[in-house]
């Protein structure tokens, strides 16, 4: 976009780890990128600090009760930034001319409405909120196509596939894609060795700096399962053409195998600023702040099959993808409730897949025709999982 006007970027989930990485890249390129909208859930002081640093036109706090604190804080800082609060205002900003690019980094199903609003408005959508695709992948991709919106994935694995496919024939001739997984902090442990895992251990990821929920998903391999479903929607591939390999070094982010026998892979240091720079500047390349990969110093690259017996969440995600309809929404919602309970010390680590499987096997699958249908399935899954927690059922 050399020679064009500033790209106006909305960073939803600005106080999280992905938001911080996005703002780091944006700040490196003031001549081409501007953080025009910043949002946060409830961390109003952190949001005010970001507003002081980046001076956006708009700032939003999702918790409406904190609106006065945001408004008064902006005034005290002498900023012209306009304060907003609540989900409806977030959706309105996503679809407004305040931005042409949206970094969708709100964790969980809460990020879906604003993501859909951005897609409906034809924005460039840098998608870090995997739940949007898992919960409503068909709806989101259909909406984006109809409005001319551009979805660029920010997950390192999907960004790798995106880059490999854009370098050749736009996806034709693909035999399979291979997502890589670090294996998380508990790689190599059996189920007995996972029973006593603590939340503090689960959020200590060996390679990536991530929020607590995503870190636990990585530890259970649910993160990789959700990425399998994402890849299905992003690249139009059936589950049979999507494989997973554990790669503990986290340097090869994904591979694409073509029908002619050739394979393309994307490599790089594990830093989200790389994929955000790809999304913000595509099809150009800009400095991200991440150094190059020195293969001589890195040494060996190892690959192994995932252990779905010890980590059944990956298998459950494939099951949900095959079932289709509302099954992925049920999977995602039950997982959110189970992970939250684990982080609060209510259940053990092995209860997470047990609770998810309980929801998948108990609730009926319906066609995912509308957002209302998907949100109803989401609510049902949360309810049945919370009921299981309340009755102390399935605690592992």
UniProtKB/Swiss-Prot annotation:
Pfam families: DXP_redisom_C (PF08436), DXP_reductoisom (PF02670), DXPR_C (PF13288). Mn(2+) binds at residues 155, 157, 227. Its EC number is 1.1.1.267. It catalyses: 2-C-methyl-D-erythritol 4-phosphate + NADP(+) = 1-deoxy-D-xylulose 5-phosphate + NADPH + H(+). Its cofactor is Mg(2+); Mn(2+). Keywords: Isoprene biosynthesis, Manganese, Metal-binding, NADP, Oxidoreductase. Pathway: Isoprenoid biosynthesis; isopentenyl diphosphate biosynthesis via DXP pathway; isopentenyl diphosphate from 1-deoxy-D-xylulose 5-phosphate: step 1/6. 1-deoxy-D-xylulose 5-phosphate binds at residues 130, 156-157, 182, 205, 218, 223-224, 227. Signal peptide: none annotated. One of its GO terms (biological process) is isopentenyl diphosphate biosynthetic process, methylerythritol 4-phosphate pathway involved in terpenoid biosynthetic process. It is an enzyme of class 1 (oxidoreductase). NADPH binds at residues 15-18, 41, 129, 131, 211. GO terms for molecular function: 1-deoxy-D-xylulose-5-phosphate reductoisomerase activity; manganese ion binding; NADPH binding. Belongs to the DXR family. Catalyzes the NADPH-dependent rearrangement and reduction of 1-deoxy-D-xylulose-5-phosphate (DXP) to 2-C-methyl-D-erythritol 4-phosphate (MEP). This is 1-deoxy-D-xylulose 5-phosphate reductoisomerase. The gene is dxr.
